[in-house]
Amino acid sequence: AVKRFVFASSVYVYSREGSFYRCSKQAAESYIEEFQNVYNLDYTILRYGSLYGPRADSTNGLFRIVSNALETGVVRYNGSPDAFREYIHVEDAAKASVNALGDDFRNQSVVLTGQEPMRVVDLLKMLAEILGLPESVEFIEGDYVGHYNRTPYAYLPKLGRKYVAPFHVDLGQ
């Protein structure tokens, strides 16, 4: 029998950003929590930040930046030079994920990000130096759906407005 359901989510889950990816993670988390309420199946939700490391592919942001830099000789970033990220190596994320299987994390959501926020521009300059490329980094700024600058977290109260029809059939009719 399944004792606990473990779900890989995202720090974007309650962000203003993240587009349909955020929506899908948010819906999944709601289903998991409700399933626990109704059927008593324990869970742990792991909200990953910006991962990097071995076995990354073109779906990984840092992988795409490195691949493009190796192909073109220029480090480019689609986004703001003011952006911050908390990068976490996949091995650190894996160890943290295993630790999150402990009883302290039963029916909890756990944020797994790097040790501290890092300016994307600093990371990219470091990357350029490691690759032996000029330290000039090109930022392609624009309105990129799903990108945040400082934090993925947001306060997003959702209000519903009650409509009362001016004319209606009375309950006693």
Can you say where each PLM-predicted feature lies in the sequence?
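Conserved Rossmann-fold NAD(P)-dependent oxidoreductase catalytic core, especially the SDR/UDP-sugar
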Residues: 1-23
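Conserved beta-loop-beta element that borders a ligand/cofactor-binding pocket
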Residues: 9-10, 31-54
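Conserved catalytic Lys-bearing alpha helix of Rossmann-like short-chain dehydrogenase/reductases
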Residues: 24-32
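Glycine/proline-rich active-site loop of Rossmann-fold NAD(P)-dependent oxidoreductases
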Residues: 26, 51-64, 73-74, 78, ...
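C-terminal "lid/loop" region of Rossmann-like NAD(P)-dependent oxidoreductases
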Residues: 80-82, 107-110, 118, 124, ...
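Conserved C-terminal active-site "lid" loop/helix of NAD(P)H-dependent oxidoreductases
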Residues: 90, 121-122, 143-170
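Hydrophobic "lid"/C-terminal helical patch
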Residues: 97-101, 124-127, 173
